[in-house]
């Protein structure tokens, strides 16, 4: 299920565009997630009160959290699959503290793909989308394996 060197290069090329504005991309990803899967908003006490897209766009906290999410994901992607040290604490907090189901990680992966395609269509064609999907699936599978070790049925 690993990615080839060429696939990792596609992933990291588009990720370079994301890093130019992590907070903006992250905010868009979270807004997309909450819009397409409103049930996910319930896991975020800090954002539950945000009911409209305009409220979400105006939220500095949402922007900060988007930055945090994509910063962590970027660190994982740059490890090109050798990300156990990054995955363990993330899985620990998401299983025991936040109780985030793996399904929600699928939802945010879909949101990431959507946002990258809408913001960077020239750099995120079918090959890059397929590579990113594979990288995000690898990430989810490794999180799920850690969840299982922790006894979390997410």
Curated annotation (Swiss-Prot):
The modification Phosphothreonine is found at residue 68. Keywords: Cytoplasm, Heme, Iron, Metal-binding, Muscle protein, Oxidoreductase, Oxygen transport, Phosphoprotein, Transport. One of its GO terms (cellular component) is extracellular exosome. It comes from the Eukaryota. GO terms for biological process: removal of superoxide radicals. GO terms for molecular function: heme binding; metal ion binding; nitrite reductase activity; oxygen binding; oxygen carrier activity; peroxidase activity. It holds the Pfam family Globin. It is an enzyme of class 1 (oxidoreductase). It catalyses: Fe(III)-heme b-[protein] + nitric oxide + H2O = Fe(II)-heme b-[protein] + nitrite + 2 H(+); H2O2 + AH2 = A + 2 H2O. Nitrite binds at residue 65. O2 binds at residue 65. Residues 2-148 form the Globin domain. Heme b binds at residue 94. The modification Phosphoserine is found at residue 4. The keyword Transport applies. Gene3D superfamilies: 6.10.140.2100, 6.10.140.2110. Its EC number is 1.7.-.-, 1.11.1.-. It is found in: Cytoplasm, Sarcoplasm. InterPro entries: Globin (IPR000971), Globin-like_sf (IPR009050), Myoglobin (IPR002335). Monomeric. Belongs to the globin family. Monomeric heme protein which primary function is to store oxygen and facilitate its diffusion within muscle tissues. Reversibly binds oxygen through a pentacoordinated heme iron and enables its timely and efficient release as needed during periods of heightened demand. Depending on the oxidative conditions of tissues and cells, and in addition to its ability to bind oxygen, it also has a nitrite reductase activity whereby it regulates the production of bioactive nitric oxide. This is Myoglobin.
